[in-house]
């Protein structure tokens, strides 16, 4: 079985400028980089991610819904 690729590498391939032309400009690029950084961090810490999720939610006082 082939090893699973990191989600960020898949997202980078899927979000190349040639594949999806957008007019959001710099904001979209910055947001995409931020989201990719968080997805990469979540992938690397996938065993400990629930603990970081709870701690981050408590610290930032954010109530996020996760549908499984």
UniProtKB/Swiss-Prot annotation:
Q: Which stretches does the entry tag as region Disordered?
A: 1-21
Any one GO CC term of the record: mitochondrion
Output the Pfam families linked to this UniProt entry: DUF4560
Q: What is this protein called?
A: Small integral membrane protein 10-like protein 1
Q: Which organism is it from?
A: Homo sapiens (Human)
What gene is this protein translated from? Answer: SMIM10L1
């Amino acid at each position: 079985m082939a090893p699973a690729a990191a989600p960020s590498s898949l997202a980078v391939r899927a979000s190349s400028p040639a594949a999806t032309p957008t007019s959001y400009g710099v904001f979209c690029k910055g947001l995409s980089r931020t989201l990719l950084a968080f997805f990469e961090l979540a992938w690397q810490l996938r065993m400990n991610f629930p603990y970081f999720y709870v701690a981050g939610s408590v610290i930032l006082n954010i109530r996020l819904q996760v549908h499984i």
